Amino acid sequence: MNVTILGAGVVGVTSAWYLAKAGHKVTVIDRQPAAALETSFANAGEVSPGYSSPWAAPGIPMKAMKWLFMKHAPLIIRPTADPAAWRWMSQMLRNCTSARYAINKSRMVRVAEYSRDCLMALREETGIDYDQRMQGTLEVFRTQKQFDAIGKDVDVLTAGGVPFEILDRDGCAAIEPGLAPAKEKIVGGLRLPGDETGDCFMFTTELARMAEEAGVTFLYDTGIMRPIVEGGRIKAVETTRGLIEADIFVAALGSYSPQFVRQLGLTLPVYPVKGYSITVPIVKEERAPVSTVMDETFKVAITRLGSRIRAGGMAEIAGFSKDLPAARQETLAHSVEDLFGGAGDQSQAKFWCGLRPMTPDGTPVIGATRYSNLYLNTGHGTLGWTMSCGSARVLADLISGNKPEIDTHDLAISRYAA
C-alpha cells in the first residue's frame, strides 16, 4: 500500500522505516528542510524504559503548588486563555490517583520496554551509530522523602520484570564517579542498568538516510494544510506542494497532531509541554557523567553524549511558545554544576527548547481512528525517543494486518471515548 506519514521527527521516521521494511511504499512530509529539526533535535538523550512514568502522579497537585515559589522550579504554568490547556490540565489532574498512576505507568513501561528491544534489533541489523551508550541510568534523590517515595515505582518495575538497583550515596558515586565530590548532596539513587542513552537527532537523521536508500520518499519544506475526505476516508492531504494522495495516512505531528485531526471532527487530548536543554562540551573528563543521571529535585536529566554533556528537562505549559527565558538556562546549568561541577564549559552552552506532545495520562496514542485509513502515532511526551521504535513497529503491524507483539487495546484514541 501507499502510506503517507505526516511528520519527520523520530516517531515519523521510525514509522517510515518499519512500514518500508514491511513492504509498503512510503512518503514522509514535513515542513522543515530536514528530519528531526523540532522536538527530536536536542532532547535529553535517554532511552529509559524503566523511568517511563506519567507526570500525572499522586502528590503532583501539591508539589505543583510548592513549585510555584521555587527559583529553579521543574514545572512552570504560564497564564493562558486557551481552553485546550485548561481542559488538558483538568484531565491530567483526574489521572493523579494511585490507581490511575499504576495503570498508566504499566502501559508506558510496556511500550517502552518493547521499544528498547526493537531499537536493539534495529541497531544490530543496520549498525547505526548515534553516540549510544548501554550503561544504564541513575536517578538521584536529594531528600530522604524523595528516596522513601520510590516504593510505587519499584512495585511497577518488579511486576514488569525490569531490573533495578537501590543505591546509597556511595553506591551512586561508584556507578558515576563524577558525582563523588557532590555525593553529600544526595541521599541515594535508583539505577536501571538496562537503560541506554544516545543522540536522538543523530539517530533520526541517519535512519532517515537509510530509509531513503530503502525507497522512502521525503518531501521536506512542505507545509501540511488540511485533509480531503471522500466517502468516510481520507482521499488526500492538501499541502504547499498540492494534493498528495495515499491509501493510508499516519499523523505523527507531535504537538500539532490535534490541529490536524480537529479538521476531521476528532478530539485528541495532546498538548505541548515545553522542555529545555543545554549542551556543553566536556572539559574535565573525570567530572563528567558516564551515562544519564536524573536529578529528581529539578526534574533534569544530565546525559553523556560523546564529548558533550546534555542537560534536559523541566516542563512548561505555555502553549506553542518557543521563547528561551534565561531563567530556564540557569536552572539547567545549576543542576549540572551542582552535581558535576566543572565538567562542562558553560560559556559554550547551546540552549534549546522543544514542544513535547503530552497526553493527560502519559501514554502515547497509537493506532486506528474512526476513519478507516487514518492512523495516529503521537502523544509520547518526554518519551518520544524512548518509545519511537516500538511505537513504529506496532503501527506497521497494525497497518499491515499483523498482530502486534504487545497488547495495544489501550493505546488507541478510542480509550478517551470511555
From Swiss-Prot:
One of its GO terms (cellular component) is cytoplasm. InterPro entries: DadA, FAD-dep_OxRdtase, FAD/NAD-bd_sf. The keyword Oxidoreductase applies. It catalyses: a D-alpha-amino acid + A + H2O = a 2-oxocarboxylate + AH2 + NH4(+). Keywords: FAD, Flavoprotein, Oxidoreductase. It comes from the Bacteria. FAD binds at residues 3-17. GO terms for molecular function: D-amino-acid dehydrogenase activity. The keyword ATP-binding does not apply. Its EC number is 1.4.99.-. It is an enzyme of class 1 (oxidoreductase). GO terms for biological process: D-alanine catabolic process. Its cofactor is FAD. Pathway: Amino-acid degradation; D-alanine degradation; NH(3) and pyruvate from D-alanine: step 1/1. Belongs to the DadA oxidoreductase family. Oxidative deamination of D-amino acids. This is D-amino acid dehydrogenase.
